[in-house]
Amino acid sequence: MQGLGIIAEYNPFHNGHLYHITNSLEQIRPDFVMAVMSGNWVQRGEPAIIDKWTRAEMALNQGVDLVVELPFLWATQSAREFAQGAVALLKDSGVISYQSFGSETGDLTLLQRAAKLSLEESEHFRQTLHNYLDQGFNFSEALAKALNLNELASNDILGIEYLKSHDLLSSDISCITVQRQGSPYHKSEISGKFSSATAIRQAAKNGDLSLIKHTVPDQTWNLLSQNKTDWIFFKMLEQHILYKFRITNKETIEQLMEWEQGLENRIYNASLDSCTLEEFISKLKTKRYTRTRLNRLMLHALMEIDKSLLNHFNTTGPPYLRVLGMNQRGRQALKTISDRASLPILTRPARDLRSLSHYCRQCFHWEVKASAFYNLLKQKDGREEYIRPPIVHPD
């Protein structure tokens, strides 16, 4: 059985994602497609606009056969840890022959060369990278300059990290890349059929529903419309974040994963001086401390997740394959996975976790906390993680 693996967030699923899947299927023609998808919180350190179950259904509507969750602890870290956690799940499933990822360059050879140079990390490369960081460039800009590339966009960076992860994990999965279509990843305005997820979320936040409709498949549009009252935006965390940092001491801030020397004083002072989230972020944001990096720091502070805890989990990796949804082809694939995988499968956590290791239960504990907080933002029950079964999609 040959599986095609895709690592995604689908926040929300849009026409660019459909193009990626369609193009990948034309190149590979696999027996099934498995997506490793972020849960209720995404790599930008933000809540997903709509919950993971609905987003899994969006994916199943458009060519994905099996959706597995990337646990919260990896889904909300930097590109390197995000990629390592997700690639580990593809590898440990035992059934994935190919991974397809989107990239701005569409040039696999170039990305492989960049990954090789980054992995080798010669003294010259390390020093060059740090020199650019010290000059105030953010990581993606500094990495591009250190690799003598004109520019590396968000999906290029992730692609490099996927390739590095396959090497570090001794994975025999082959990679392909599909060039990203339409507007840049961070562009916040709708611009045609292939608009970015950022632009789609911004239009949703502004209530411009008519602008969204032509940027997503019809079934995605229906799910977004039907669940409009459950949309979640980062702004909803405003009071939680300001309160947290006003009562948090500097020593605690220093233990956060994204922290660097001196930031604790700026955070503490900004929290006292700011009355809105935008004001707070504007006092902290620099070229090096991007909004995304600050978002992750703020989320980890809210969840009381420090660098020692993340280092503990990063050392071992995701401990299970948690199924969010599947169709009939996905169910057949899951039977093969149960025979070949090096990790246990979770379909009903309340039952399955009883026989699993303390490490598995520890990891799932953070999933429960993260989803309970997410559901609080939309005034829903906080016990969902233990009791909700996977979506079974009709073919």
From Swiss-Prot:
GO molecular function, one term: ATP binding
Keywords: ATP-binding, Cytoplasm, Ligase, Nucleotide-binding, RNA-binding, tRNA processing, tRNA-binding
Chain segments annotated as transmembrane: none
Catalysed reaction equations from the record: cytidine(34) in elongator tRNA(Met) + acetate + ATP = N(4)-acetylcytidine(34) in elongator tRNA(Met) + AMP + diphosphate
Alphabetized InterPro entries for the sequence: Rossmann-like_a/b/a_fold, tRNA(Met)_cyd_acetate_ligase
Keyword Nucleotide-binding: yes
Top-level enzyme category: ligase
Gene Ontology terms: cellular component: cytoplasm
One Pfam family this sequence matches: HIGH_NTase1
E.C. numbers: 6.3.4.-
Function: Catalyzes the formation of N(4)-acetylcytidine (ac(4)C) at the wobble position of elongator tRNA(Met), using acetate and ATP as substrates. First activates an acetate ion to form acetyladenylate (Ac-AMP) and then transfers the acetyl group to tRNA to form ac(4)C34.
Similarity-based family: Belongs to the TmcAL family.
HAMAP family in UniProt: TmcAL
Protein name listed in UniProt: tRNA(Met) cytidine acetate ligase
Organism: Natranaerobius thermophilus (strain ATCC BAA-1301 / DSM 18059 / JW/NM-WN-LF)
Gene assigned in the entry: tmcAL
